[in-house]
């Protein structure tokens, strides 16, 4: 490779897209590769008016698109994605907005590196709510 090609490769700036998706909201937070500096942060509640629309895939898509536009303006060309659900004693599965957010980031022109699930898993942590016999429906 010539020296010019090496310089072009070095200048590619990557970030991390932290996607927190619950059944109440979706939060997209893009940071630099170390995770220390925030580049862009959007949530479903920031892009829709009605509270009931916050967790929807549509709100997640809009939030991800705006976050991606902001990141591209600041020189980020690609992101590694870290998906997180509430976890712990709460839901271990990401909400409905997670997949839509990943798709929107890809469509917005960001390169996608690795996608990993960083949901906290308890190693026998706190007692789940609902009492001894669980939630009776």
UniProtKB/Swiss-Prot annotation:
Keyword list, A-Z: Ribonucleoprotein, Ribosomal protein, RNA-binding, rRNA-binding
User: Gene3D superfamilies recorded for this chain?
Assistant: Ribosomal protein S11 (3.30.420.80)
State any GO BP term from the record. Answer: translation
Q: Which GO terms describe its cellular component?
A: ribonucleoprotein complex; ribosome
The Swiss-Prot or TrEMBL record annotates one GO molecular function as: rRNA binding
Q: Name one Pfam family in it.
A: Ribosomal_S11
Region span, Disordered: 116-137
Record keywords: Lyase included? no
The entry's family comment says: Belongs to the universal ribosomal protein uS11 family.
Q: How does it assemble?
A: Part of the 30S ribosomal subunit.
Tell me the function of this protein: Located on the platform of the 30S subunit.
Q: What is this protein called?
A: Small ribosomal subunit protein uS11
